[in-house]
Design a protein with these regions (language model features):
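FIC/Doc superfamily catalytic core
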Residues: 1-131
Length: 131
């Protein structure tokens, strides 16, 4: 499986916004763009999400977008959910998929350890080797 792909292409900014709205609605939280981060994040996402990139770069883009805080609530859940869906679509064995979704979610949320980041990077590098 090639390491460099258009991992985030299915997830338009409209999808990102709708995902955040669903998360907010489920928790009775305000779904609203922020005045400081929304436009910057939207531009970044629209410039990058269709480009081929390594999986670890796609995770980093989601992390950056989370940190820019485009919405009032659930930014981390929004972007972690997207990257978890990307990993789900790899059709990996269930145990491996669970671990990788967890690692990617931690990286996006900014709570990963160096060891977790290293493990995820090693998995990403293995994609080119077909392992």
């Amino acid at each position: 499986m090639p390491r460099i792909r258009t991992w985030l292409a299915p997830y338009s900014w409209e999808f990102v916004t709708a995902q955040n709205a669903l998360l907010c609605h489920a928790k009775n939280a305000l779904h609203k763009p922020t005045s400081e981060g929304h436009d910057t994040t939207q531009r970044l996402w629209e410039e990058r999400h269709l480009q081929p990139m390594p999986l670890d770069e796609a995770v980093d883009l989601c992390r950056r977008c989370h940190r820019l805080a485009p919405f009032c609530f659930y930014n981390g859940n929004t972007f972690a959910g997207i990257i978890r869906d990307v990993i789900h679509n790899l059709n990996l064995p269930p145990e491996e998929a669970f671990i990788l979704r967890s690692l990617a979610g931690h990286i996006v949320a900014g709570v990963s350890t160096g060891e977790e980041e290293k493990a995820f990077r090693e998995f990403c590098e293995s994609l080119d080797r077909g392992q």
